Each structure stands twice: as C-alpha cells, then as structure tokens.
Amino acid sequence: PHDPLRRQRQMCIRDRSQHLSSGASKVILTAPAKGDIRNIVFGVNDSALKESDKIISAASCTTNAIVPVLKLISDNYGISNGHIETVHSYTNDQNLIDNFHKGDRRGRSAPLNMVITTTGAVKAVSKAIPELKDKLTGNAIRVPTPNVSLAVLVLNLDRSVERDELNEFLKTSAFASKYREIIGYTNSPEAVSTDFYSSPYATIIDSQATIADGKQITLYCWYDNEYGYTKQVLNLTKKVASIDLQRFPKAIEDSV
C-alpha cells in the first residue's frame, strides 16, 4: 500500500544524500528531521551520535531551548504531562503583507499581527528525551519582533516542589552542572526580550516568572532564536568534525 510518510522520509534522506555523493563526509540539518535521522540537542543527547551517522539534525531553535530544561525537570522531578507554548519572533516563512500561504494564518502580515500557529519542536523533544513521548502538547504564537523568543513550559510533575526550591535547583544547574554552558539563568525583575540579544545560551530561565503550585509548575525560558541556536549548531559541528579545542583553566568536574 502507498505510505506517504514513508515516501516523505525516503525523499528527505535522498535529497540530503546528494551532499554525501558530492564529497561531504557528514551533513548537518538546521531543522528538525523526520524518519530515522537523529535529532541532536548538543549538551543533552549528543552522546548518542555514532560514526555511522552521516545525516544529522541539529533540531530547531525552540527544541534546543526547551529540551535542556525538560531533561533537568524530568530527571529530578518526573514529568507526567505538559504543554509548551512558544512566543516566537516572526520568520521568513511568513508574509510581510497579507497574502496566500499554505499555513492559512501565516499568510497574514507578520509585522502587524500576533499569529497562532503550530510548532514541530514538541514532536522533536521525544527524539532527544524518549521518556517524554506522547506526554507533551505544543503551540506557537508568532509575534512582530525581529529576534529573541520565549518558551512557556506548563508541566505536571510526579512530585510536588516549592517555588524557591525549584528556582534554587535551576540556578545551581545553570551555574554548576554539565548544562552550565547551554542553560542561562536570570533573576532580574526588569528583564525583557531585547536583554537577551546575542545570548550564547540555548535557553535562559527567567526565575522571577517561575510558578510552582504543588505538582504543577510554569517556567519561562528566553532564547535568542538566531545567535543562541547558531552556537548550538557550531558546538554540534565541532563534535561531528572531532574538533576538540583545549580550554584553560581546566573545566570543573560536572556535579549534575
């Protein structure tokens, strides 16, 4: 029988394989991949990479922003289910003025509207964190700002946690764990989106906005969807290319 999804996966692999046949040893996609292609979020599941992986996905900017935080919460508190809402700067997939678009609402003028649309980031989460498969829903609101986006994570946990305890855990993880180079943390009561232009982190937790009510928590995570994501892609590229630059002084041992 005809399987359109299988055909789509085959086309995706075939199209990217043309780079390999032209002499490239590896291909890294800067978008979520379907099928059997690995979706890698550097710093979280890059240890799953194998030498035999020729085509690799660096996932999306939003996936890179939410996966490190979701992994932290899942490992330490457990996640029963949740919803991810991303308030995302508009992109070149949208129209500058009202026009036709296969995505209906995305056809409306991007600089003039907030646009409710879909996000593929949540589906990509389960490729990086398999235990969260079918536990999360997601949506996106495209807004008329040029850069820096915000992910809102509403999660139901397996055990209760107080707000101060949760923020302290997130702060410690951001400053003294293996995630310290990809997770940022701010407690500024005046923080707004432009404060995070050119942030090198994949995500920055806004502790002032944290909500904890028993087993339900809400986290607000800023991310520069251009620069922060590019940093993640570069780190993944260096790993794939086996580029290991020495750092001084020697990095501290990971505590988390």
Q: What are these regions, as identified by a protein language model?
A:
Residues 1-9, 13:
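Single conserved hydrophobic/aromatic residue that forms the stacking wall/gate
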Residues 7-10, 52-61, 109-113:
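Flexible, glycine/proline-enriched loop segments at strand-loop-helix junctions
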Residues 14, 20-23, 30, 60, ...:
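Alpha-helical support elements that line or immediately flank enzyme active sites
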Residues 14-54:
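Rossmann-fold NAD(P)-binding glycine/threonine-rich loop
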Residues 38-42, 68, 94-100, 232:
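Short acidic, glycine/serine/threonine-rich loops at helix termini
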Residues 42-61, 78-85:
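Rossmann-fold dehydrogenase core element
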Residues 78-217:
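C-terminal substrate-binding/catalytic lobe of Rossmann-fold NAD(P)-dependent oxidoreductases
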Residues 200-256:
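NAD(P)-dependent Rossmann-like dehydrogenase/reductase catalytic/cofactor-binding core
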